[in-house]
């Protein structure tokens, strides 16, 4: 037997418990990222566009490549439904997410779609906010979410790798999207870019958005060896060169770092990119009070 719960825009079928030993394949069938609560607010409703998805590669350097998932408004008549094979937080256990995008769908035409980059936490992966990515694409945005090398569930390297590379990765994704040709390149408008960063993604967004690091950041016990983090110091030529006029707004969600002396008042005062910050009152990792 099963219980059928009808929401505003979806039907959720809840299987009656039959066994305490369900396989992960069975459990995965319920991992839907496109369900809406009956009381979902207006901005959470599905947009007017069907959604396509594709996978690309962005080059940060000759030795650093990022796998990037890209969601986009698709052509009218696109049939919804795709799955995303991914891993749980342990980096070993496979799972599958089910959404409403269509893999390699024809691209919508007739308008320009602003770009939004979604940057995951440490660890995480490009599917961490895939529910948000599908929703934004349905509203008319192109959304690019990278796997940050050295910072994913299956590739979790020293924390300093993330401290150094996160804002560099974020800019590289914009560069890769701007270099696209063909229908998707015609659709995406990289002169208007928003950046959503979760936790360490928010740390990167703060730096990329204008808040250069304080000298105390170089003394953090998990900072990369050799002083390479100095390239992000407030007032440095390298941090100034990182700034990007294409970046129009940032949305850090629980950004890590301010409670770890990564910034000071002078560095934060350099932030001139429009910012909308989200934080949780019981966040004891990024530290709500510090945010």
Please identify what each model-predicted range represents.
Residues 128, 158-191, 203-209, 217-236:
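Alpha/beta-hydrolase active-site loop
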Residues 200, 256-257, 281-284:
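Acidic beta-to-alpha connecting loop that harbors the catalytic carboxylate
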Residues 98, 103-113, 118-155, 260, ...:
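Short substrate-entry loop that stabilizes the transition state in hydrolases
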């Amino acid at each position: 037997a099963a219980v059928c719960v009808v929401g505003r825009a979806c039907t959720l079928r809840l299987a009656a418990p039959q066994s305490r030993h369900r396989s992960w394949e069975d459990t995965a069938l319920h991992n839907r990222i496109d369900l809406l609560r009956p009381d979902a607010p207006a901005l959470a409703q599905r947009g007017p566009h069907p959604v396509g998805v594709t996978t690309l590669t962005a080059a940060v350097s000759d030795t650093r490549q990022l796998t990037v998932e890209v969601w986009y408004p698709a052509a009218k008549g696109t049939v919804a439904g795709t799955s995303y094979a991914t891993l749980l937080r342990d980096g070993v256990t496979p799972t599958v997410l089910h959404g409403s995008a269509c893999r390699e769908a024809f691209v919508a035409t007739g308008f320009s779609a602003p770009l939004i980059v979604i940057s995951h936490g440490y660890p995480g992966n490009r599917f961490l906010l895939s529910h948000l990515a599908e929703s934004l694409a349905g509203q008319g945005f192109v959304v690019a979410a990278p796997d940050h090398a050295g910072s994913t569930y299956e590739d979790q390297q020293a924390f300093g790798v993330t401290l150094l590379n996160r804002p560099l990765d974020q800019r590289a994704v914009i560069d890769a999207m701007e270099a696209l040709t063909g229908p998707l390149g015609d659709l995406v408008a990289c002169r208007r870019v928003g950046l959503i960063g979760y936790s360490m993604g928010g740390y990167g967004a703060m730096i990329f958005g204008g808040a250069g690091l304080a000298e105390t950041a170089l003394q953090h016990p998990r900072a990369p060896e050799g002083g390479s983090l100095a390239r992000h110091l407030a007032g440095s030529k390298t941090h100034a060169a990182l700034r990007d006029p294409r970046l129009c707004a940032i949305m850090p969600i629980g950004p890590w770092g301010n409670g770890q002396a990564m910034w000071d008042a002078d560095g934060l005062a350099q932030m001139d990119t429009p910012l909308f910050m989200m934080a949780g009152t019981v966040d004891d990792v990024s530290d709500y009070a510090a945010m």
